[in-house]
Protein backbone atom coordinates (compact mmCIF):
# COMPACT_ATOMS: atom_id res chain seq x y z
CA UNK A 1 0.00 0.00 0.00
CA UNK A 2 1.31 3.41 -0.85
CA UNK A 3 0.21 6.94 -0.08
CA UNK A 4 0.10 9.75 -2.52
CA UNK A 5 1.55 13.21 -2.12
CA UNK A 6 -0.20 16.11 -0.46
CA UNK A 7 -0.55 19.64 -1.62
CA UNK A 8 -1.80 22.97 -0.30
CA UNK A 9 -3.89 25.48 -2.13
CA UNK A 10 -2.38 28.35 -0.19
CA UNK A 11 -4.08 31.31 1.46
CA UNK A 12 -5.93 33.93 -0.46
CA UNK A 13 -7.96 37.00 0.39
CA UNK A 14 -11.05 38.13 -1.39
CA UNK A 15 -12.28 41.64 -1.81
CA UNK A 16 -14.50 41.19 1.23
CA UNK A 17 -11.53 40.36 3.42
CA UNK A 18 -12.61 36.70 3.81
CA UNK A 19 -9.63 34.52 4.49
CA UNK A 20 -9.78 30.93 3.30
CA UNK A 21 -7.85 28.28 5.12
CA UNK A 22 -5.50 26.00 3.33
CA UNK A 23 -6.87 22.81 1.87
CA UNK A 24 -4.90 19.59 1.83
CA UNK A 25 -5.72 16.78 -0.52
CA UNK A 26 -4.37 13.32 -0.01
CA UNK A 27 -4.81 10.25 -2.08
CA UNK A 28 -4.03 6.70 -1.27
CA UNK A 29 -3.12 4.13 -3.81
CA UNK A 30 -3.28 0.47 -3.00
CA UNK A 31 -1.93 -2.51 -4.81
CA UNK A 32 -2.71 -6.08 -4.06
CA UNK A 33 -1.32 -9.31 -5.34
CA UNK A 34 -2.53 -12.78 -4.81
CA UNK A 35 -1.44 -16.19 -5.92
CA UNK A 36 -3.36 -19.39 -5.96
CA UNK A 37 -1.85 -22.77 -6.47
CA UNK A 38 -3.62 -26.07 -6.61
CA UNK A 39 -2.40 -29.50 -7.49
CA UNK A 40 -4.27 -32.72 -7.85
CA UNK A 41 -3.49 -36.24 -8.89
CA UNK A 42 -5.81 -38.99 -10.01
CA UNK A 43 -4.77 -42.59 -10.27
CA UNK A 44 -6.91 -45.51 -11.30
CA UNK A 45 -6.09 -49.11 -12.03
CA UNK A 46 -8.31 -51.91 -13.13
CA UNK A 47 -7.88 -55.55 -14.06
CA UNK A 48 -10.25 -57.90 -15.80
CA UNK A 49 -9.75 -61.64 -15.86
CA UNK A 50 -12.01 -64.21 -17.44
CA UNK A 51 -11.63 -67.94 -17.89
CA UNK A 52 -13.93 -70.41 -19.52
CA UNK A 53 -13.91 -74.13 -20.24
CA UNK A 54 -15.98 -76.14 -22.64
CA UNK A 55 -16.18 -79.91 -22.36
CA UNK A 56 -16.37 -81.81 -25.60
CA UNK A 57 -19.11 -84.37 -26.08
CA UNK A 58 -18.56 -87.99 -26.95
CA UNK A 59 -20.21 -89.90 -29.75
CA UNK A 60 -20.44 -93.66 -29.73
CA UNK A 61 -19.80 -95.38 -33.03
CA UNK A 62 -22.65 -97.30 -34.49
CA UNK A 63 -22.66 -101.04 -34.47
CA UNK A 64 -22.93 -102.76 -37.81
CA UNK A 65 -23.66 -106.40 -38.17
CA UNK A 66 -25.08 -108.39 -40.99
CA UNK A 67 -26.36 -111.87 -41.41
CA UNK A 68 -24.31 -114.05 -43.70
CA UNK A 69 -27.28 -115.35 -45.53
CA UNK A 70 -29.60 -118.22 -44.83
CA UNK A 71 -28.19 -121.72 -44.26
CA UNK A 72 -28.81 -124.26 -47.01
CA UNK A 73 -32.04 -126.16 -46.73
CA UNK A 74 -31.94 -129.54 -45.09
CA UNK A 75 -32.19 -132.54 -47.38
CA UNK A 76 -32.72 -136.21 -46.74
CA UNK A 77 -30.07 -138.80 -47.41
CA UNK A 78 -31.02 -142.32 -48.00
CA UNK A 79 -28.27 -144.74 -47.25
CA UNK A 80 -28.51 -148.08 -48.90
CA UNK A 81 -26.95 -151.24 -47.71
CA UNK A 82 -24.51 -151.14 -50.60
CA UNK A 83 -23.11 -147.78 -49.51
CA UNK A 84 -22.87 -148.83 -45.91
CA UNK A 85 -20.89 -151.95 -46.67
CA UNK A 86 -18.16 -150.29 -48.61
UniProtKB/Swiss-Prot annotation:
Keywords from the named record: Biological rhythms, Cytoplasm, Nucleus, Phosphoprotein, Repeat
Sequence repeats, residue ranges: 30-31, 32-33, 34-35, 36-37, 38-39, 40-41, 42-43, 44-45, 46-47, 48-49, 50-51, 52-53
Compositional bias of kind Gly residues: 31-64
Region named Disordered: 1-86
UniProt-annotated location(s): Nucleus; Cytoplasm, Perinuclear region
Entry GO terms, CC: nucleus; perinuclear region of cytoplasm
Biological process according to GO: rhythmic process
Domain topic, free-text comment: The run of Gly-Thr is implicated in the maintenance of circadian period at different temperatures. Deletion of the repeat leads to a shortening of the courtship song cycle period, and thus could be important for determining features of species-specific mating behavior.
Reported function: Essential for biological clock functions. Determines the period length of circadian and ultradian rhythms; an increase in PER dosage leads to shortened circadian rhythms and a decrease leads to lengthened circadian rhythms. Essential for the circadian rhythmicity of locomotor activity, eclosion behavior, and for the rhythmic component of the male courtship song that originates in the thoracic nervous system. The biological cycle depends on the rhythmic formation and nuclear localization of the TIM-PER complex. Light induces the degradation of TIM, which promotes elimination of PER.
Subunit structure: Forms a heterodimer with timeless (TIM); the complex then translocates into the nucleus.
Name of the protein this chain belongs to: Period circadian protein
Amino acid sequence: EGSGGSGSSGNFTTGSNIRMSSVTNTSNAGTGTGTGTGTGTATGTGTATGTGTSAGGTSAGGNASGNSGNPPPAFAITLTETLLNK
